[in-house]
A protein has these predicted regions:
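Conserved C-terminal structural/oligomerization subdomain of aldehyde/semialdehyde dehydrogenase
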Residues: 27, 70, 77-192
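Aldehyde/semialdehyde dehydrogenase
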Residues: 1-80, 111-146
């Protein structure tokens, strides 16, 4: 799931307004109900961890733009949450949040965006949204992740290699690269 949203300053305010409205429209509920758009977290421990992460982020200077707490109902539900103003010295900057928490970062240019994107211990996937596809390709090449999607968030298919870099793993699953993970190759040399 997308967690860190790095926005150019020219679109940040407009994006945040539309994003916030979309989060307000999320329907929390039973994942078996087709009208539900956000189900529960996997466990009470996951809910407690996420609650502590958000509280700690705010305590360390992040702004709670929306949400930020467990939903008062049976189950392990957490409100769709948006955090802004996270600085590098905030623990949230380097943590992974496993739940509906979006971190918003604002940058002045592509170089800042790439530097911020790469300043992470993780690198499973990323996405670049742009009307300029050549610019997006340059950025995708510079982003340190195992997968980058342009104008799309994520996808999977048997023919697409899946995997990350840094603390998000080594090697690939799926595709011919995934099959090679299960092959032991042997070198045999005959000296003449």
């Amino acid at each position: 799931a997308a967690k860190r949203f790095i926005l150019h300053e020219n679109i940040a305010e407009s994006f945040l307004a539309k994003f916030s409205e979309a989060f307000r429209q999320v329907k929390i509920g039973d994942p078996l109900d087709e009208s539900t758009t956000l189900g529960p977290l996997s466990s009470k421990d996951a809910l407690d961890t996420l609650s502590k992460q958000v509280d700690e982020a705010v305590k360390n200077g992040a702004t709670l733009h929306l949400g930020g707490k467990a939903v008062a109902r049976e189950g392990n539900f957490f409100e769709p949450t948006i955090l802004t103003g996270i600085t590098r010295d905030n623990p949230a900057y380097f943590e992974e949040f496993f739940g509906p928490v979006a971190q918003i970062y604002v940058v002045k240019n592509d170089e800042e965006a790439i530097q911020l994107a790469n300043d992470s211990h993780y690198g499973l996937g990323g996405a670049v949204f742009s009307q300029d596809i050549e610019r997006a390709k340059r950025m995708a090449s510079a982003i340190e992740t195992g997968m980058v999607y342009i104008n799309w968030l994520t996808d999977t298919a048997p023919e697409l290699p899946f995997g990350g870099v840094k603390r998000s793993g080594f090697g690939r699953e799926l595709s011919d690269l995934g099959i090679k993970e299960f092959v032991n190759q042997k070198l045999v040399v005959v000296h003449k």
